[in-house]
Amino acid sequence: MNRIAFLLVAVAAVAGVIALTAPAFGHADEAASPIYGVKIPDGYRDWKLIAVTQLVTAKGTQLRAQVGNDIAFKAYQDGKLPFPDGSIIVALHWTRVSSESNNKILDGPFPGDQSFVVGSRVNMQIMVKDSKKYPASGGWGFADFTGDKPGDEALHKTCFPCHEPAKDRDFVFAHFAP
């Protein structure tokens, strides 16, 4: 009888571990990007910071932060290219806005708009390295989400062509900020 009870507890524990670890890139019921099937990764807001960038275009200015899972972060830290399979990089993009409260404080020594902070969220872009699953796109799967909704197929068809100029850096734009 004790053996049966132990076996039932062990089976339940294994089933619980599998259920908790199965969704590697998000929950099964979440939206996935067309073409690549990439989902928003669970826990990405707890990942390590890789880089902070600013994008200035005719459409406006964005502040951007790139975070990576442990595999991607270690590759950046070690300067390892190409990135190993399992690397995931998430780029978070916001509008850049002037900080009225900071600028009031800085107004004496530094008049004018001197301090800028993140404004509204623009989008999130995700790169997942799996050289077997994505051989036609340099080993990377891509996703572009606005809110929790992926962009359409036409948008996702532009991902790899956009990244092709960065081929010498394994198709990744972000430089590591040590």
Predicted regions and their residues:
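Sequence context surrounding c-type heme c attachment/ligation sites in exported
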Residues: 26, 30-33, 37-61, 80-178
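N-terminal post-signal-peptidase region of extra-cytosolic proteins
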Residues: 63-79, 109-110
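Positively charged n-region of N-terminal signal peptides that target proteins for export
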Residues: 1-5
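Bacterial N-terminal signal peptides
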Residues: 8-21
